[in-house]
Amino acid sequence: MIKRIVDISKNLKKGKVLIVYGPRQVGKTTLIQEYLSKTSFKYKYSIGDDLQLARDLSKCTITSTINYVGNYDLLVIDEAQKIPNIELALKLMVDTFPEKYFIATGSSSFDLASQTAESLTGRKNVIDLYPISQFELSKDISRDELIHQIESFLIYGSYPDVLNQTTYLEKEKVIKQLTNSYLLNYYCFKPSWCA
C-alpha cells in the first residue's frame, strides 16, 4: 500500500469536524481505516449507507445526538453526504460535545461541501484527497521505475485501483468503470439549470 502524505492526526482538532473530501475511489476510507488502526481513541465508525443511522441522525435532536455519540472520543461517518441533514447533525454534535473529535468523509465534494458550508462555518477542518501523487509514488517506487511508467500514469492516472492493476487492459477496464460511474451519476442527478 502506498503511504499518503495526508496526515489525519495533524488535522484532527477537538470541537471541529474533519471533513475529508475527494472523488470516488481515491482512498478516503482506506486513509481513515489506516488512521483508526493506530489511534488510541475510543472510536465509533459508521457508514452513511446505514439506513438506521441516517434516520437517527437526520432527526437532529439532542436525544439522537447523545445516543449516537455515547462515550466515544472520536466519531467517524464515512460517506456522510448520504445522510439527510448531515450538516445540522454534525453541527449539533460539535456544539453539544466540543471535547470530542469528529471525522466525516464525502465522495461527492459538491454535495457535502454545499451541505456543510454554512452550518459548519468555524467548526470544520477540510482535507481534499486526490488520486495518488507522483510525490507519494516516489516514496515507494524508484525514480527509474517512475520514469519507465510515466506513459501509463499519463494515460490511466493514479487512482489506487488503477495502480494495483498489472496490465494495460486491466487499467483500462478500471478507469472506464470509474468514468462511467461519474457520467451515469451526472446524467441521473445533473443540475436543473443544465439542459
Where are these regions (language model features)?
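Conserved catalytic/switch belt of AAA+ P-loop NTPases
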Residues: E87-F110, E118-S119
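Pre-Walker A adenine-sensing motif
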Residues: M1-K13
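Conserved lysine of the Walker
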Residues: K28
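Short regulatory helix/loop adjacent to the ATP-binding pocket of P-loop NTPases
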Residues: F110-V126, I141
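Interdomain hinge/linker elements that couple catalytic modules in large macromolecular machines
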Residues: D128-A195
